[in-house]
Regions:
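Cationic, histidine-enriched alpha-helical/coil surfaces that engage anionic ligands
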Residues: 1-203
Length: 203
């Protein structure tokens, strides 16, 4: 993604970053549909999750109706890309997982591998169906129109603030949340800490 100037109006900086991420999704969409390489899905998924993190940070910059609709779309895309990506990782690492167990164990586990392949095919089919659907195409097109079109006359109260200080405050807040959750971590809460660490990384 390109760099943004810290003195840029916050809404322009957010739109620039989100437009870069939309480009990443567009570049990886067809390769994901055709299953040319697992990295296409990985790139698409990361861009969708980063878009969600940027939208979450833009509560006083991006109009509420725009942000709400975009977050719904990216949440759906994140949900649909999760299963096939997880199965890609499992199957790409299968040899490394099973080799230490010896050749006999690897043979015994072949039905498990076959099951994972079937599940992978089903997960990709579900994702591909949605990526080619009218809903997905409409969402992507309307999102692109908002990112590149004129700004609305009425904007949230921090939309025209300088980008740098606004983002710096959000990063400090996300870091503080991560540290608080890390200090209070329990066996039941690692997912919360993981999610917060991703928020910091994506910002």
């Amino acid at each position: 993604m390109g760099f943004t100037k810290p003195d840029l109006p916050a809404i322009e900086g957010f739109r620039s970053v989100l437009a870069d991420l939309a480009d990443v999704i567009a570049r990886n969409r067809q390769g994901t549909i055709e299953r040319l390489d697992p990295e296409f899905l990985h790139g698409l998924r990361v861009a969708a999750r980063r878009s969600r993190a940027v939208l979450a940070a833009g509560g006083r910059v991006i109009p509420d109706d725009v942000r709400r609709e975009a977050r719904l779309g990216f949440a759906l895309l994140s949900d649909l890309t999760g299963p096939p990506r997880d199965l890609d990782v499992y199957l790409l690492g299968w040899a490394a997982y099973t080799e230490p167990l010896g050749p006999h164990a690897a043979v015994d586990l072949e039905p498990v591998r076959a099951h994972l392949i079937r599940a992978q095919d089903e997960a990709y089919a579900t994702l591909t169906t949605w990526l080619q659907s009218e809903e997905a195409l409409d969402r992507l097109a309307s999102w692109r129109r908002w990112l590149t079109g004129p700004l609305p006359e009425v904007l949230p109260d921090r939309a025209l603030d300088p980008l740098g200080p606004y983002v710096a405050k959000r990063i400090r807040r996300a870091q503080a949340t991560l540290l608080d959750e890390g200090r209070a971590i329990t066996a039941e809460s690692p997912d919360e800490v993981r999610a917060s660490s991703e928020d910091v990384r994506y910002l």
